UniProtKB/Swiss-Prot annotation:
Protein name: Serine/threonine-protein kinase tousled-like 2
Residue ranges, compositional bias (Polar residues): 31-44
InterPro entries per the UniProt record, alphabetical: Kinase-like_dom_sf, Prot_kinase_dom, Protein_kinase_ATP_BS, Ser/Thr_kinase_AS
Ranges in coiled-coil conformation: 264-293, 334-372
Naturally occurring in which organism (per UniProt): Xenopus tropicalis (Western clawed frog)
C-alpha cells in the first residue's frame, strides 16, 4: 500500500492533506510516500469530488501573540505537517493499526434506505473541509475530527450492499406494482366514467322515450274517452225517444222538470189497455154464455122457455139453447183465451219491469252527462302532473268522482275532488278540511282485500282538494237492489260474509275503527253482480276507538249525533239526553242485519218508504223493538235467527263484531257438516224402519 501512495500524484496528495488538516497547500513538493498513502486511504473519492471541494476564506490574523504551533517553524511560517497520512487516519478516525483506511470514510449507503433517500448526509470531508490556505488551530482541528468520528459511528448500520440492493429491488418492484395498480385503477375509472356517461345518455334517451310514451298514452286515452263520451251521448239521445226524457214545465212563477215516458212505455201501456179490453169482452161473453147454459140431465126445461125463444126470434137474435157439449166447448174456449191474455199480461209486466230498470240507468246517465257538462274538469286535465281525468262517475253534495288514469303507476284510479262552497266561512271550510284529513289518515293505513285502498291525497287550491282511491269497475249494492229488488239467500250470505270479514279486520287493528256508515251505497260490487267480490268504502264518519275515548264496558261517546243514514243506525244512536250516547262496534253489527234483511226481502226492516226526517220525527228506530219477517220470499230459519241476533234492540243483548265473525250461520264447514249429517241419520232411520217392517211381515 505504501508503494501505491508513493506512486500518487504529488498535487493530489497535497490537496488531500489540505482537506483533512486544514493547512494551506504548500508550494513545495511533498514526498511521494505521503501522497500515495493519502490516495490509498481515500481511494473512494474521485478527482471530481476533490476539485469541487469548497474552500473557506482565511481567518483574519489575530493581533495578539499566541503560542506557536508545533507545526510552525522558528521563523513563524507555516510549514506542511511532517507526519504521514497514515498517522492522521489513526488520529482522526481512531482506527487501529489493523483497520483499513477505507472503512474510516462514513458510507452513506450504510444508513437505512429511508434515511438515505430522505435525509442524505454530507461526506465528512464536505462537512469539515477548511480552506486550503488558512492557518489551522490544532485543537480546533482535533475537535472537529472527533465530532466527525462520533457522527460516523452514529450513522453506521449493519446493512450490507446486498441487503440494500435487495431492499431497493423490492421497493422498486412494489413501486412498479403500485404504479401498475394505479394505472389499472385509472383505466377502470376511465371505463366507469365512460360507462356512466353512456348510461346517462341512455337514461336521457329512455326518459325522452318514456315522455313520448306518456304523451302518446295521454293522447290515446283522451281520444278513447272522447269516443266513449260521444257514444254515451248518442245512446242517450236514442233512449230519450224510446225510454223518455225530462221536460221543463212551468208552474206559476217557477219551472220544474217533469218526466215524460218514451214510445216503448207507451206501446206497452197500449198493449195493457188492449188486454184489459179483451178481458172485459171475454167476461161479458162468458156471462152471456152462462145464460144459455143448458139444463142438467134429468131436469125439465122451464115453462117460459118457449116464450123466451119466441121473444128472441121477434128481436132478431137467434139465441137458441145450447146443448151441453156446445156449452162446455164454448166455456173451454173462453178459459183458454183468458189464460192466454193472462200470460201475455205477465210478459208485458215483465217487460215493463225490465224497461223500468233500463229507464233508471237512462235517468242516471242523463244526470251524469248533465253534471259532466257543467263540471270545470270536463276537458281532461292532468291533476298533480300524474292523474289524467277521463270521465265523471258521479257527483255528491260537495264532491265529484272521476275515473282517471295514473300516468306514473299505469293504472286506473278513482279521483274524488272535494270542492268547498266559496261562500262558506273560513271556520266551516277549516272544519270540512279537517274532517277530510281525518278520513284520509284513517283510510290511508287500511290494507285489506275487502276495503277500497286509498292511494294519494293532494290539494288543488284553497277551496278544493283530491283523494285518489282504488277504482272498481262495477256499481254499488244500492244500485243493484234498485235494479233487481232482492237476491237469493246464498248471494246475500256471501256478501254478508265478506262485510263481516272486513269488520273483523277493522276491529283487530290498533286502534280499532267503527265504520258507522255501513249501507248498500258504501258497498261496491267489483263485478257489478251479487255473486262476486265486494269492497267497503267511505270512511268519512268512522270512529277511532283509541284508549283516551273508548271504554271496553260503555264504549265511546257519539260526538256526531244526527249524522249517518238513519235506516241503518241502531236505537242507541237516537237517544237524546244530557250526555251523548255511548256506542261500540255493535253499531256496525246492526247495520249488517239491516243490509242482510234488505237483500233478502227487497225492503228495509224499519222505516221503509220513509224519509230521514220522518224517521227522526216519528222515532221509528226507537220503536223498532222487534223485527217482523214477511211470508215471501221464503227464507231459512237460520237466516232469520241470524238477523234477530244482529237486530237485538238492547245493545247489551246484541252480539259484537268478534262474535259475529264466529257466528255458526257464517261458517260454511259447520253448516255443511250439519246438513250432511241430517240426511245420513234420516237414511239410517229409514233403513232400520224398513228392516223392522220386513221382519214383522
Amino acid at each position: 500500500m505504501m508503494e501505491e501512495l508513493h506512486s500518487l500524484d504529488p498535487r493530489r496528495q497535497e490537496l488531500l492533506e489540505a482537506r483533512f488538516t486544514g493547512v494551506g497547500v504548500a508550494k513545495a513538493p511533498l514526498n511521494s510516500e505521503s501522497s500515495n498513502q493519502s490516495l490509498c486511504s481515500l481511494g473512494s473519492l474521485s478527482d471530481k469530488e476533490l476539485e469541487q471541494t469548497p474552500e473557506k476564506k482565511q481567518n483574519d490574523q489575530r493581533n495578539r501573540k499566541r503560542k506557536a504551533d508545533p507545526y510552525e517553524t522558528s521563523q513563524g511560517k507555516n510549514t506542511p505537517r511532517g507526519h504521514k497520512i497514515s498517522d492522521y487516519f489513526e488520529f482522526a478516525c481512531g482506527s487501529g493499526p489493523g483497520t483499513s483506511p477505507g472503512r474510516s470514510v462514513p458510507p452513506v449507503a450504510r444508513s437505512s434506505p429511508q434515511h438515505s433517500l430522505s435525509n442524505p448526509l454530507p461526506l465528512p470531508s464536505q462537512q469539515c473541509s477548511p480552506p486550503s490556505t488558512a492557518p489551522v488551530n490544532p485543537e480546533h482541528s482535533c475537535a472537529s475530527f472527533k465530532h466527525i468520528s462520533v457522527q460516523h459511528r452514529c450513522t453506521q448500520s449493519d446493512l450490507t450492499m446486498d441487503k440494500i440492493s435487495a431492499l431497493e429491488n423490492s421497493k422498486s418492484s412494489d413501486l412498479e406494482k403500485k404504479e401498475g395498480r394505479i394505472d389499472d385503477l385509472l383505466r377502470v375509472n376511465c371505463d366507469l366514467r365512460r360507462q356512466m356517461d353512456e348510461q346517462k345518455k341512455m337514461l336521457e334517451k329512455y326518459k325522452e322515450r318514456l315522455n313520448r310514451c306518456v304523451t302518446m298514452s295521454k293522447k290515446l286515452l283522451i281520444e278513447k274517452s272522447k269516443q266513449e263520451k260521444m257514444a254515451c251521448r248518442d245512446k242517450s239521445m236514442q233512449d230519450r225517444l224510446r225510454l223518455g226524457h225530462f221536460t221543463t214545465v212551468r208552474h206559476g212563477a217557477s219551472f220544474t222538470e217533469q218526466w215524460t215516458d218514451g214510445y216503448a212505455f207507451q206501446n206497452l201501456i197500449k198493449q195493457q189497455e188492449r188486454i184489459n179490453t179483451q178481458r172485459e169482452e171475454i167476461e161479458r161473453q162468458r156471462k152471456m154464455l152462462a145464460k144459455r147454459k143448458p139444463p142438467a140431465m134429468g131436469q125439465t126445461p122451464p115453462a117460459n122457455n118457449e116464450q123466451k125463444q119466441r121473444k128472441n126470434k121477434t128481436n132478431g137474435a137467434e139465441n137458441e139453447a145450447l146443448t151441453l157439449a156446445e156449452y162446455h166447448e164454448q166455456e173451454e174456449i173462453f178459459k183458454l183465451r183468458l189464460g192466454h191474455l193472462k200470460k201475455e199480461e205477465a210478459e208485458i209486466q215483465a217487460e215493463l219491469e225490465r224497461l223500468e230498470r233500463v229507464r233508471n240507468l237512462h235517468i242516471r246517465e242523463l244526470k251524469r252527462i248533465h253534471n259532466e257538462d257543467n263540471s270545470q274538469f270536463k276537458d281532461h286535465p292532468t291533476l298533480n302532473d300524474r292523474y289524467l281525468l277521463l270521465h265523471l262517475l258521479g257527483r255528491g253534495g260537495f264532491s265529484e268522482v272521476y275515473k282517471a288514469f295514473d300516468l306514473t303507476e299505469q293504472r286506473y284510479v278513482a279521483v274524488k275532488i272535494h270542492q268547498l262552497n266559496k261562500n262558506w266561512r273560513d271556520e266551516k271550510k277549516e272544519n270540512y278540511h279537517k274532517h277530510a284529513c281525518r278520513e284520509y289518515r284513517i283510510h290511508k293505513e287500511l290494507d285489506h282485500p275487502r276495503i277500497v285502498k286509498l292511494y294519494d291525497y293532494f290539494s288543488l287550491d284553497t277551496d278544493s282538494f283530491c283523494t285518489v282511491l282504488e277504482y272498481c269497475e262495477g256499481n254499488d249494492l244500492d244500485f243493484y237492489l234498485k235494479q233487481h229488488k232482492l237476491m237469493t239467500e246464498k248471494e246475500a250470505r256471501s256478501i254478508i260474509m265478506q262485510i263481516v270479514n272486513a269488520l273483523k279486520y277493522l276491529n283487530e287493528i290498533k286502534p280499532p275503527i267503527i265504520h258507522y256508515d255501513l249501507k248498500p251505497g258504501n258497498i261496491l260490487l267489483v263485478n257489478g253482480t251479487a255473486c262476486g267480490e265486494i269492497k267497503i268504502t267511505d270512511f268519512g264518519l268512522s270512529k277511532i276507538m283509541d284508549d283516551d275515548s273508548y271504554n271496553s264496558v260503555d264504549g265511546m261517546e257519539l260526538t256526531s249525533q244526527g249524522a249517518g243514514t238513519y235506516w241503518y243506525l241502531p236505537p242507541e244512536c237516537f237517544v237524546v239526553g244530557k250526555e251523548p250516547p255511548k256506542i261500540s262496534n255493535k253499531v256496525d253489527v246492526w247495520s249488517v242485519g239491516v243490509i242482510f234483511y234488505q237483500c233478502l226481502y227487497g225492503r228495509k226492516p224499519f222505516g221503509h218508504n220513509q224519509s230521514q226526517q220522518d224517521i227522526l220525527q216519528e222515532n221509528t228506530i226507537l220503536k223498532a223493538t222487534e223485527v217482523q219477517f214477511p211470508p215471501k220470499p221464503v227464507v231459512t230459519p237460520e237466516a232469520k235467527a241470524f238477523i234477530r241476533r244482529c237486530l237485538a234492540y238492547r245493545k247489551e243483548d246484541r252480539i259484537d263484531v268478534q262474535q259475529l265473525a264466529c257466528d255458526p250461520y257464517l261458517l260454511p264447514h259447520i253448516r255443511k257438516s250439519v246438513s250432511t249429517s241430517i240426511p245420513a241419520n234420516a237414511a239410517v232411520a229409514s233403513t232400520s224402519g224398513s228392516s223392522n217392517n220386513s221382519l214383522s211381515n
